[in-house]
Swiss-Prot record:
Claim: Ribosomal protein is one of the keywords in the record: no
Name of the gene: SLC38A9
The protein, known as: Neutral amino acid transporter 9
Outcome reported for the amino acid change (mutating T453A): Does not affect L-glutamine transport activity
GO terms, biological process: amino acid transmembrane transport; asparagine transport; cellular response to amino acid stimulus; glutamine transport; L-arginine transmembrane transport; positive regulation of TOR signaling; positive regulation of TORC1 signaling
Segments for region (Important for arginine binding and amino acid transport): 129-134
Topology feature Lumenal, residues: 141-146, 226-283, 335-356, 416-437, 501-507
Length: 561
């Protein structure tokens, strides 16, 4: 969801002649572009200024926006017969650009005609968007696939998803007779597949959103539990590594799944029998029985806000969290050293073979880790030099692949074997560090706060997509919104209590949403467009049908792992 946890992307456009450091928050446009970029549909409660001052448009401008929204539903974006007339469009100073996270940013007009993002900013935005919760499960995925196989799978999946993303970017240019400059990818799907394409894209988009929200709930429960445990142990001078299989050194690493059949440990802790205070704490601070419910009282009210604009201000925490994880992994690897042995097919007591048949679990995780296909057109629209889109996309994917390789390889290679087996690597690699570890505690605090600010944004997106399509209003009533939020929160609580396996949740949701957006739609649209132009050849047909088969197999095989 991808990554769903760090997007607040901006959709301004202009052609520039002079370079100026626009920065990712500087949204500018050329007045002549205003007509080509309509319609805008921004609800007043969604307006947020780049200077962090909450704003509302006038009632008159709001009414005009609603009329523009009505015009936009009467025809496809390429059909200019029903384009909103000039007198309906708000003045430039009243126009805002919609961000995928549900907020809006005010346009800044520059008559000089510059203001699009540089390639560096575009590359960073793509990298930042893809960096999500999947990064915590990459080391576990490498363990499931085998060290050598895991590295090869990461590289191959990066190349495959890059090609499919390239096909998404080029999909608009395959329709020569239509003006597709303002189209997004759902518009392309609707053009080729009609209402089925529109509703199926909505369905798979909701799968990725709700899957991400469930993963967030499981992780927030985990991080909140370990944070409370760290504070309690610090106050009472309890060493939690004494009651669990761990290494005996200044940088302890634990194996929570030892004695639980290799499954993630969902219990809280083990205390000495005569420690009444600790027993009471264990009773009321349990990872699966109590903590997931504590989050309900905190997050459910936030989901009912009409606008998530306040939370969008904390998106920079996503970048900070990833950078801190890179620092943490590097520091631990330097202190622990590398522990590797190579056995191609036969496992040993402490090491896994280089080739394991559970590698599809890693492909499922990576499908979501490399997932950006539903919003890549939006991100690249802001690129200053459109001719560099493909180059910048390739560079961004290369950086994402290197980041995943860096995290996964360092965690796997530095995991202390012996005395612990590589099979002890958890689906969330932070679980391999005791709650008393200060650096891991800081990482959990960072991630907990960041996820608590992103979670309402994901809920808002789910509300916009589902209620907006069904009722034509993203906030039909507090009752409708509350019912939807209770269903989403309930799903998160149930999974946190009974299936707190983020690796499993990520690979299922990744394979499901990737089936449509990554594998089927890009390949099928390319085949149809070539067939319409009578340029379809057997090699191209076979290759893209093979990609579709890979996507279907990737989903099916997840249920047998």
């Amino acid at each position: 969801m991808a990554n769903m946890n760090s997007d607040s992307r901006h959709l301004g456009t202009s052609e520039v002649d002079h370079e100026r450091d626009p920065g990712p928050m500087n949204i500018q446009f050329e007045p002549s572009d205003l007509r080509s970029k309509r319609p805008f549909c921004i609800e007043p409660t969604n307006i947020v200024n780049v200077n962090h001052v909450i704003q509302r448009v006038s009632d008159h401008a709001s009414a005009m926006n609603k009329r523009i929204h009505y015009y936009s539903r009467l025809t496809t974006p390429a059909d200019k017969a029903l384009i909103a007339p000039d007198h309906v469009v708000p003045a430039p100073e009243e126009c805002y650009v919609y961000s995928p996270l549900g907020s809006a940013y005010k346009l800044q007009s520059y008559t000089e005609g510059y203001g699009k993002n540089t390639s560096l900013v575009t590359i960073f935005m793509i990298w930042n968007t893809m960096m999500g919760t999947s990064i915590l499960s990459i080391p576990w995925g490498i363990k499931q696939a085998g060290f050598t196989t895991g590295m090869c799978v990461i590289i191959l999946m990066g190349l495959l998803t890059l090609y499919c993303c390239y096909r998404v970017v080029k999909s608009r240019t395959m329709m020569f007779s239509l003006d597709t400059t303002s189209w997004e990818y759902p518009d392309v799907c609707r053009h080729y597949f009609g209402s089925f394409g529109q509703w199926s894209s909505l369905l798979f988009s909701l799968v990725s959103l709700i899957g991400a929200m469930i993963v967030y709930w499981v992780l927030m429960s985990n991080f909140l539990f370990n944070t409370g445990k760290f504070i309690f142990n610090f106050i009472h001078h309890i060493n939690d590594t004494d009651t669990i299989l761990s290494t005996n050194n200044s940088n302890p690493v634990i194996c929570p799944s030892a004695g639980s059949g290799g499954h993630p440990d969902n219990s809280s802790m083990i205390f000495y029998a005569n420690d009444t205070g600790a027993q009471q704490f264990e009773k009321w601070w349990d990872k699966s029985r109590t903590v997931p419910f504590y989050l309900v009282g905190l997050l459910l009210p936030l989901l009912n806000f009409k606008s998530p604009s306040f939370f969008s201000k904390f998106n920079i925490l996503g970048t900070v969290s990833v950078l801190y994880l890179i620092f943490l992994v590097t520091f631990k690897a330097v202190r622990l050293g590398f522990h590797l042995e190579f056995h191609w097919f036969i496992p040993t007591e402490f090491f896994v073979p280089e080739i394991r048949f559970q590698f599809p679990q890693l492909t499922g995780v990576l499908t979501l880790a490399f997932f950006i296909h539903n919003c890549i057109i939006t991100l690249l629209k802001n690129n200053k030099k459109q001719e560099n889109n493909v180059r910048d996309l390739c560079i961004a994917y290369m950086l994402v692949t290197l980041t995943y390789l860096y995290i996964g390889v360092l965690v796997f290679a530095s995991f202390p074997s012996p005395p612990l087996s590589k099979d002890c690597i958890e689906q969330n690699f932070l679980d391999n560090f005791p709650s008393s570890d200060t650096l891991s505690f800081i990482a959990r605090i960072f991630l907990l706060f960041q996820m608590m600010t992103v979670y309402p944004l994901l809920g808002y997106l789910a509300r916009v997509q589902l209620l907006g399509h069904i009722f034509g209003d993203i906030y039909p009533s507090i009752f409708h919104v509350l019912i939807l939020n209770l269903i989403i929160v309930g799903a998160g609580v149930i999974m946190a209590c009974f299936y707190p396996n983020i690796g499993g949740i990520i690979r299922y949701s990744g394979a499901a949403c990737g089936l449509a957006f990554v594998f089927i739609y890009p390949s099928l649209i390319y085949i149809i467009s070539l067939h319409q132009e009578e340029r379809l050849t057997w090699p191209k047909l076979i290759f893209h049908v093979f990609i579709i088969i890979l996507g279907v197999a990737n989903l099916i095989v997840q249920f047998f792992m």
